[in-house]
Amino acid sequence: EKGFAEARIIKVLKQSPLAAEARCDHYWICSKLQTLSYEEQLKEKEKQVVDAFQRIGGFTDFTINGVRSAENKYNYRNKMEFTFSPHRWILESEPEGVDSSFALGLHIPGRYDKILDINTCHIQPDIGNKILGIAREVCLKNLDLKPYDPKTNIGFLRYLMLRFGVKTNQLMVNIVTAYDDINKLSPLIDTLLKEVPEITSMVNNVNTRKADVAFGEFENLIFGNSFIEEKIGNLKFEISANSFFQTNTYQGKVLYDEVLKIAGLNGDEIVYDLYCGTGSIALYL
C-alpha cells in the first residue's frame, strides 16, 4: 500500500531501549510485537486507534482514553484452532531433509496452504501445549491419521480445536475431520483421554466441504458434555464447540465492567445485543 512498507531484520547493530526478549520461538512469524516492551505495545495500540479516527474517519476533535493493560499477558486465550496439514512450512534455521509432509500448528500469514508446525504456544494455557504434543506424536505413529489437503481434497484430519474454561478448569477437545469415521480416530481419542484426565468434553465436528473452516455440518459427541462452562463475573456460560465467545476471559470482564460503568443503567432500560454470539455483554448488564 502506498505510504507503507514492511521490513525484515537482518542484523541488530544497536538494541533499542524499548526492546524486550520474545518468549515465543516463532515470534517473527506469529507475533513480532513480542520484541517490544508491553508498555510500548499499549502505546502503539493507542496510536492505531487515533490513526483510525483521524486518517480514516476524518475526525479532528476527539479524546482517546489510554489502553487498559492486561494482568495476564500469556496463557490467557480460552480458544485455539490448530490446523493439520501435509504442507509444513520449513524454517530457514532447520536442517535440510526435514519432513514437510506433516504439520500441526498455525497458518503462515498470507498463506492458506502452509502451516507452521508448533510445539508451544504461549498464549494458550500450558495444558494446551501438552495436548498439542500428544496429538502430533499419535498422528505421526498412525498412518491412517493423515492431514487433510485443501488443494486435493484428500486426507482426514483438519483441525484440533481447544476450548479452555479458565475460570472453571473445564477443557474441550474438538477434532475436526473431513469425513465421519470415529473408529479411525480411536488412537487419538484413547490416548488423549488416558493422558489428559483434565479433558471434560471431547467432540468430533465433521466438515465434508472444501471450505477451510473449523466447524462442521454435524457433530459427534465422544466424551463428557457437548459444551464447557466459563464464568465472567457472577454469570456462568455454556460454550459449545462452534459458539462465539470472548477469547480472553480476563480482559472480557475488564471490558464488560467498563461498559457497565459507562452505560449507567438503572434496570428499566431495554438492551439490544446485536451480533452477540452467546449474548454475554447484555446478560452482564
Regions found by a protein language model. Name each.
Residues 1-285:
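Accessory RNA-recognition modules of RNA-modification enzymes
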